[in-house]
Design a protein with these regions (language model features):
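Histidine-/acidic-rich catalytic cores in large beta-rich domains
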Residues: 36-409
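Short intrinsically disordered, low-complexity coil segments enriched in acidic
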Residues: 1-2, 72
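Bacterial N-terminal signal peptides that target proteins for export
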Residues: 6-18
C-alpha cells in the first residue's frame, strides 16, 4: 500500500520557504468586534462564551478532557446540541473525548469516547480507558465498542480515547494502551515494564489487522521527554508504566495506509494495513525522521494530524519551545522528501497537551487549543489569508480544558 502523497499543482504555488511562510500574528489579528454572546446551556453543562461568527454551513464539535460535556455549535456559534453528565467519581477526570461525526453509506452517525472510570489508567493522566459510544442521526445510542479478543487483548478490554475511525457500522479501527513487561529494549535485558500502543481493526467482530509498538524495538530509541520526563524510564525507577510512544491521532491516506501521530516520539508514522509484519512504511519528524527535516522544522509533542490533499497538517503543541504551531508538510513518500508548506503561530499561544487543527477551503483554520496554558480560549477560527480571527470560543472555567474542537459539514 505504499504510495506517494502527490502535491496538487494549484497548492504547490503556496509552498514557500519556512521563513517566508511563517505568519507572526501579534497585532495581525484584530479583536473580534461583536460583544460576547452567551449561549443558553443545559443545567450543569460547561459554560462557554462566543465572539464573532462564520458563514460555515456545518457544525463545531467540542469535547472535554476532564469532564462529561459534549457541545455542538453551528457556524454562528449557537449551541444546537449538548450533553452533560456528572462524573461518576468526583475529581476522577472521567471525561468524554473525541466527539465526532461519521458519514457511512449515506447515513449519519456520531461518536465519542466514554472514559467510564471502571478501568485502570496505569496512573497516566493522558490515558483514558473506556468505551466508544456510537449515536445515530438523532443522537440515540446505537452501540458501545470495546476491543475484540486477539493475541494481546481479551474481548471487552477498554479502548483508549484518543481516536477512532468508523469505516462501517461494524467495521472500525480502534486504539488502546496496553501494559506489559518486555525484553527487547537494548540495554535492559532484565526486562522493563512499559505502556505501549495497540491498534486493532475489526470487521464484523473479527480482528482483521493489528499493530503493536513493542514489535518495533527501534522506537524505544526515539522516545523524547518533552511531554513527560518519565516516558523513557525503562529502568522503572520512577514509574512502572513509561508511556514511551503515546499514540494520539490517526487518519487513512489515499492508499489506505494508516497515518498516526505519536506524541512521545515527536513523530508521524505511516502503517501498512495490508501487512502483519514490517508494517512501518515511513517516519516523519522526530529522531527517526526519514525525510531530512531540519530540527526547527520537526514537531514537538504534536497532538493531531490530518491528511489534507497533498499535505500532512499537524497541531504541533511544541512543548520544546512552548509556542504552539500549525505546520503543514508537502510530502513525497516515494522519494522520502518533505518540505514545510505552511507554518503559522500566534505569539504567546501555547497548548501543552491535547488540541486539534483543520484546514478548510479559503485558507480557514479551525483550531482547538486543548490544554491552553496562558488563556481560556478553547477554539478559534482564523482566516490566515486575510489575517482575521473570525470566531473565538472561551471557557467560563479555564481548568475544564477541551480535548478537541473540530468541524464537520
Amino acid at each position: 500500500m505504499q504510495g506517494v502523497m502527490k502535491v496538487n499543482k494549484t497548492h504547490k504555488i503556496l509552498v514557500t520557504a519556512l521563513t517566508t511562510c511563517m505568519l507572526m500574528v501579534s497585532g495581525a489579528f484584530g479583536t473580534v468586534a461583536d460583544a460576547a454572546k452567551k449561549p443558553v446551556v443545559a443545567e450543569g453543562l460547561q459554560g462557554i462564551s462566543v465572539k464573532g461568527s462564520t458563514d460555515l454551513p456545518g457544525h463545531f464539535f467540542l469535547s472535554f478532557a476532564f469532564s462529561r460535556n459534549l457541545i455542538m455549535l453551528d457556524g454562528k456559534g449557537n449551541i444546537v446540541w449538548s450533553k452533560h453528565e456528572a462524573e461518576p467519581k468526583p475529581g476522577g477526570h472521567t471525561g468524554w473525548w473525541d466527539f465526532k461525526k461519521h458519514k457511512v453509506k449515506g447515513k449519519t452517525y456520531y461518536s465519542y469516547h466514554d472514559q467510564t472510570g471502571a478501568y485502570d489508567n496505569y496512573g497516566l493522566l493522558g490515558y483514558a480507558p473506556g468505551e466508544r459510544v456510537i449515536l445515530d442521526e438523532h443522537f440515540k445510542e446505537v452501540k458501545r465498542i470495546t476491543f475484540e479478543a486477539s493475541g494481546v487483548t481479551a474481548k471487552g478490554a477498554p479502548l483508549d480515547g484518543h481516536d477512532f475511525l468508523l469505516i462501517d457500522l461494524d467495521h472500525y479501527i480502534l486504539s488502546g494502551y496496553l501494559h506489559d513487561k518486555v525484553y527487547n529494549i537494548p540495554g535492559y535485558a532484565q526486562g522493563s515494564k512499559v505502556v505501549y500502543s495497540y491498534l486493532q481493526e475489526v470487521d464484523h467482530g473479527k480482528v482483521v489487522w493489528d499493530w503493536k509498538s513493542i514489535d518495533y524495538p527501534e522506537l524505544y530509541g526515539y522516545t523524547i521527554t518533552e511531554g513527560d520526563p518519565r516516558s523513557n524510564d525503562f529502568a522503572n525507577q520512577k514509574t512502572d508504566a513509561p508511556d514511551y510512544v503515546h499514540f494520539n491521532a490517526m487518519r487513512l491516506d489515499e492508499s489506505g495506509n494508516l497515518v498516526c501521530s505519536f506524541r512521545h516520539l515527536n513523530s508521524i508514522l505511516c502503517l501498512d494495513r495490508s501487512k502483519r509484519k514490517d508494517q512501518i512504511v515511513w517516519k516523519l519528524s522526530g529522531r527517526g525522521d526519514e525525510f531530512g527535516l531540519a530540527e526547527n522544522e520537526k514537531s514537538s509533542c504534536q497532538h493531531y494530524v490530518t491528511v489534507d490533499g497533498g499535505y500532512l497538517t499537524l497541531f504541533d503543541n511544541n512543548n520544546r519551545d512552548k509556542q504552539t504551531r500549525i505546520t503543514s508538510y508537502a510530502v513525497n513518500t516515494a522519494d522520502k522528501k518533505a518540505e514545510v508548506a505552511r507554518f503559522y503561530y500566534i505569539p504567546g499561544k501555547y497548548s501543552q497537551a491535547c488540541g486539534s487543527v483543520q484546514h478548510l477551503p479559503g485558507d480557514l483554520y479551525v483550531i482547538g487549543w486543548g490544554w491552553a496554558v496562558n488563556d481560556n480560549e478553547c477554539m478559534s477560527v482564523y482566516n490566515f489569508a486575510t489575517g482575521k480571527k473570525l470566531m473565538s470560543v472561551t471557557l467560563d472555567n479555564p481548568k475544564n480544558i477541551t480535548y478537541r474542537c473540530v468541524y464537520y459539514e
